[in-house]
Amino acid sequence: MKTFTAKPETVKRDWYVVDATGKTLGRLATELARRLRGKHKAEYTPHVDTGDYIIVLNAEKVAVTGNKREDKMYYHHTGHIGGIKEATFEEMIARRPERVIEIAVKGMLPKGPLGRAMYRKLKVYAGNEHNHAAQQPQVLDI
């Protein structure tokens, strides 16, 4: 018996839509990363992108436990000397709520070209509307 290896051209990708309202950030992100990698499929192959497309709605309503709403910090650097910037979870949700979920999921994906290809299949929206109706996404309950 031979080991099965998925071919990139034969992988069937589905579209799913997830509502993030009231979901805990980390628990949601782990399931999204798992599905973006394709680990839920029988034909999962580590070196091939076998994951599905995922649309996340209501990113502004994602929940965190404990004091993370005030205490969790996000950092980025502008590239200039002394250009480190920081923002709390509350500030990130107010300014760009999509980035909170994107950052959490991106950290759970592989680093390198394969991980970037997986990350591109994640579509996050702050509100309840998305422009992927033509793909006929299925509702995914996480």
From Swiss-Prot:
A GO CC term assigned to this protein in UniProt: cytosolic large ribosomal subunit
This protein's record includes keyword Ribonucleoprotein: yes
Alphabetical keyword list: Ribonucleoprotein, Ribosomal protein
Signal peptide: none
GO terms classed as biological process: negative regulation of translation; translation
Superkingdom of origin: Bacteria
Gene3D superfamilies in the cross-refs: Ribosomal protein L13
PANTHER family registered for this protein in UniProt: LARGE RIBOSOMAL SUBUNIT PROTEIN UL13M (PTHR11545:SF2), RIBOSOMAL PROTEIN L13 (PTHR11545)
Family label: Belongs to the universal ribosomal protein uL13 family.
Protein purpose: This protein is one of the early assembly proteins of the 50S ribosomal subunit, although it is not seen to bind rRNA by itself. It is important during the early stages of 50S assembly.
Designated name of the protein: Large ribosomal subunit protein uL13
Organism: Klebsiella pneumoniae subsp. pneumoniae (strain ATCC 700721 / MGH 78578)
